[in-house]
Amino acid sequence: METTDGGSEAPPVPYVRFQSPHRNNRGHFTGVFGLVNNLARDGMLSDAEETFRRHNNRWYDAAYADPSTVTPDVYDDEVNPGAAAWFKPSATHLLARVHGYLEILSTHGVDCRELRSADPGRVVYEDDVQVVVVPHGRDETTAFRPEPG
């Protein structure tokens, strides 16, 4: 744990995630990139928004690994129920580009919340810019199961 010059412990710097406040049909909270990609898939983006999305999605793809290409079952609900990616606080170069995605969501009336946590869950994947965690209290016995209907 880091300490300040006075010898007391510094508060932990939190991980950051941007996600919908509402569960999707699989019981998960869709992240910021998925929310914008859903708008694109539904044909809702303007030409400028689509250009932004494609350009920045390519930039993110080049800037950091997709955890599922490194650990194929990282998002498998049977293995890691509710797994979600969080930015590390040191990933400032990645966080700087999120604002444009948030603007697109705001324009389209799509809710997206910023979450910060020093301990978002059990880490199942980690690299230099992100962690994927299973949220506390979400394991194979407590995994969300959508109601049939």
Regions found by a protein language model. Give the residues of each.
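Intrinsically disordered, low-complexity segments used for protein-protein interactions
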Residues: 14, 89, 132-134
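Acidic, proline/glycine-rich low-complexity IDRs
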Residues: 103-149
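Long, contiguous N-terminal structural blocks used for assembly/anchoring
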Residues: 1-85
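Extracellular-facing segments of soluble proteins and assemblies that are Gly/Ser/Thr-biased and enriched
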Residues: 87-111
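Intrinsically disordered, low-complexity boundary segments flanking structured domains
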Residues: 1-6, 99-100, 118-122
